[in-house]
From Swiss-Prot:
PANTHER family: BIOGENESIS OF LYSOSOME-RELATED ORGANELLES COMPLEX 1 SUBUNIT 5 (PTHR31784:SF2). The modification N-acetylserine is found at S2. Pfam families: Muted. Keywords: Acetylation. It comes from the Eukaryota. The keyword Acetylation applies. Component of the BLOC-1 complex, a complex that is required for normal biogenesis of lysosome-related organelles (LRO), such as platelet dense granules and melanosomes. In concert with the AP-3 complex, the BLOC-1 complex is required to target membrane protein cargos into vesicles assembled at cell bodies for delivery into neurites and nerve terminals. The BLOC-1 complex, in association with SNARE proteins, is also proposed to be involved in neurite extension. Plays a role in intracellular vesicle trafficking. Octamer composed of one copy each BLOC1S1, BLOC1S2, BLOC1S3, BLOC1S4, BLOC1S5, BLOC1S6, DTNBP1/BLOC1S7 and SNAPIN/BLOC1S8. The BLOC-1 complex associates with the AP-3 protein complex and membrane protein cargos. Interacts with BLOC1S4, BLOC1S6, DTNBP1/BLOC1S7 and PI4K2A. Component of the biogenesis of lysosome-related organelles complex 1 (BLOC-1) composed of BLOC1S1, BLOC1S2, BLOC1S3, BLOC1S4, BLOC1S5, BLOC1S6, DTNBP1/BLOC1S7 and SNAPIN/BLOC1S8. It comes from Rattus norvegicus. GO terms for biological process: anterograde axonal transport; anterograde synaptic vesicle transport; developmental pigmentation; endosome to melanosome transport; melanosome transport; neuron projection development; otolith morphogenesis; positive regulation of pigment cell differentiation. Residues 1-27 are annotated as: Disordered. This is Biogenesis of lysosome-related organelles complex 1 subunit 5.
């Protein structure tokens, strides 16, 4: 199968076993070598497809690049047309729409900002009035408390004096009652 005519008779001679002992051992080794060589060739022809696949790959790459090149050219042309259309038609429309919407949005935002600013001023004024009122009330209460504390010793002295007078009257009353009782106990 290797393509040479001498290989087959050698293999046959080895299979027939013709010849001397020395020749048999040499023939068997040579025949085995030839058989291995034939098996290698069979293997490469049946199972090794590198040359065929390389040719197919080259063909596929060539076809792919040709078709791909045309397809990419069409895609790039379409993209160019879309970009031109966008620049000429869509972009000005978008700018106009954006500017119109942006102006309206800015006006609303300014109105909302002014409204919030007024609300904050009112709230600050209200807090200031409340704080001023609280501060004035606190000062007034502090003055009242100080006046109350200043008048406290005098009131205490008055209460103590009244208490002493009441105690003195009670003593006199009890003393008078004791005298009256002493008069009645003699009976």
């Amino acid at each position: 199968m290797s393509g040479g005519g001498t290989e087959t008779p050698v293999a046959c001679e080895a299979a027939q076993g013709g010849g001397g002992k020395k020749r048999d051992s040499l023939g068997t080794a040579g025949a085995a070598h030839l058989i291995i060589k034939d098996l290698g060739e069979i293997h490469s022809r049946l199972l090794d497809h590198r040359p065929v696949t390389q040719g197919e790959i080259r063909y596929f790459v060539k076809e792919f690049e040709e078709k791909r090149g045309l397809r990419e050219l069409r895609v790039l042309e379409n993209l160019k047309n879309m970009i031109q259309e966008t620049n000429e038609r869509m972009l000005p429309k978008c700018r106009e729409t954006m500017q119109g919407g942006l102006e309206e949005t800015l006006q609303r935002l300014q109105a909302a900002t002014d409204s919030i600013h007024r609300l904050q001023q009112r709230e600050q004024e209200r807090k200031k009035v409340i704080n001023d009122h609280l501060t004035a009330s606190e000062k007034q209460r502090m003055l009242q408390w100080e006046e109350f504390l200043r008048g406290q010793p005098q009131r205490r002295a008055e209460v103590d004096a009244e208490h002493r007078k009441a105690m003195e009257r009670l003593r006199e009353q009890y003393a008078a009652m004791e005298k009256d009782l002493a008069k009645f106990s003699t009976f």
